[in-house]
Amino acid sequence: MRDLPFTLDQLRILKAIVKEGSFKRAADSLYVSQPAISLQIQNLEKQLNIPLFERSNKKATLTEAGNLLLRYGGRILALCEETCRALEDVQNLQGGNLVIGASQTTGTYLMPRLIGLFRQRYPQVNVQLQVHSTRLISWSVANGQVDLAVIGGEVPNELKDTLQVTSYAEDELALILPTSHVFSKLPDIQKEDLYRLRFIALDTQSTIRKVIDKILIQHDIDSSRFKIEMELNSIEAIKNAVQSGLGAAFVSVSAIAKELELGILHWAKIENVTIKRMLSIIINPNRYKSKAAETFSKEILTLFVTPAA
């Protein structure tokens, strides 16, 4: 068996340099000196007998060989981390890490409650929550950076053969209005009334907006005719804008529980129209699933949201 021309530490250093963009910042992130970083890279290039970085510019730019080593090195480091976690599982949830991913709305309003309950039951497990777009979270699960995730949209087409997607629960979306709006006095509104409203919306690339547009079309409602007053980048900003009387909006019911209880927002029902999306749990079946992830799936995820029949 041949000796390896690199060490795990050298692979970590290479990854850090690319991530941080320079030798100095990589050294700071690894809590070592810059000369030590440079020496490790010089030794690595000598062992491989090939340059890994372009020496013609100040930025840390990889050569073709450097990119190749980075790609395979990342997989090696991920497998080492996976091995360590598998060994930790021998301790039966007496420690270890659990990284959970979620898309924006789910990660903001549902997952913190579930993670809080899990920590009460298993305080020894270190739980991290990553909240990003459905696309970014899907890639994190595929790459092994996240154990499992709950998302509200579809995984990217290029990952559908990689990820296992399981329907989890229905998430109803509500049309919210200021309590002072004339429509808030009605038991429900008609489809045609939607075209008279001014809307506060997420940007056109958001998962929720795409789902809403798709479902409205199924009910013969053309969302392209809506008067969009403004586009905001967070649900909290949208709720505040609606509460201030700036317009109407569609948001997840899970995001407005407190506001409905306090009576500061109105949930307007549309006659014969119900807008729901399916939340999904995604995992990478080709990667090791820790006992912490298995326990979270079986004990916690089923507690707050009842799956659709």
From Swiss-Prot:
Family matches, as SUPFAM superfamilies: Periplasmic binding protein-like II, Winged helix' DNA-binding domain
Compartments, as annotated in UniProt: Plastid, Chloroplast
A Pfam family assignment: LysR_substrate
GO cellular component terms, A-Z: chloroplast
Key word DNA-binding present: yes
Highest taxon of the lineage: Eukaryota
Segments forming domain HTH lysR-type: 6-63
Family matches, as InterPro entries: LysR_subst-bd, Tscrpt_reg_HTH_LysR, WH-like_DNA-bd_sf, WH_DNA-bd_sf
Record has Transcription as a keyword: yes
Entry keyword set: Chloroplast, DNA-binding, Plastid, Transcription, Transcription regulation
Single GO term (MF): transcription cis-regulatory region binding
Chain residues forming the annotated DNA-binding region: 23-42
Function as written in the Swiss-Prot or TrEMBL entry: Trans-acting transcriptional regulator of RuBisCO genes (rbcL and rbcS) expression.
Family under the similarity heading: Belongs to the LysR transcriptional regulatory family.
Protein's recorded name: Probable RuBisCO transcriptional regulator
